Amino acid sequence: LGIPTVVDRVIQQAIAQVLMKKLDSSFSEFSYGFRPRRSAQMAVLKTLEYINEGYDWVIDLDIEAYFDTVNHDKLISILREKNVNDSTTLHLIRKFMQAGIMEDGLVKPSRIGVPQGGPLSPIISNVYLDKFDKELENRGLRFVRYADDCNIFVKSEMSANRVMKSVTSWLERKLFLKVSATKTKVVRPTKSKFLGFTYLKMNGEWKCKPSNQSKMKLYDKCRKELVRRIGIARSIAVTFRRINQIVVGWINYYRIGVMKYFIDVFGQWLRHKIRVIILKQW
């Protein structure tokens, strides 16, 4: 992450607010990341809509090191196409992208890529990939994009493989982005993972649920809090409060998914861990 200084952050925030106000309405309705009044849950619900309409072959697109490979000249060109022509603004955006990284006490300027961690990064990522969104729209494809996570939905495996090959070529030729040959794949919904969710069919209808990796992360976070309490002799009340925050946050994020059975199993595990802690105090 490229964490900007206070002054840089203020300038970036000012530019980001102006760009968002000017450009957000021009972005694709199928782009959900880093945009006002949009969320990951809305993106996942849109994927469910496609799948239940019969577009149940998924192209799970993986752009290699997206933020590290954004082409500066191409980005400035796209901004000009969107009537962002103020020379001072464009100069500041380019300076931000070229801020570089510190290695062995020396600053190495960046020739490509966008530093992550600043207020400008999200809007710039959407500006750059909006070209891709419009290309998919022009082709009449069903897709959902959240930042650099993009899934495309079609009705047959043959179409999916053809589209995957075509959009991979387009991204490399037009936006100079490399698509991972090993991570990009054509799958059925049950094998697809998007924003921490996967899919299952219940009574003839597709539903979403937390992926196994997402479930394991919840276990790991709670387990670490319980172990950490022992290591630093933290009060049991503080530990329970922190675990409650983790669990409530997790459930809130995955609230649109099927998870009753998992929550029951997880609850039993957590109650057992808590009982052990309480017994050890006596």
Residue ranges and their predicted role:
Residues 23-27, 55-57, 71-74, 105-108, ...:
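Short acidic (Asp/Glu) and glycine-rich catalytic loops that position anionic groups and cofactors
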Residues 26-38, 42-191:
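Conserved polymerase palm-domain catalytic core
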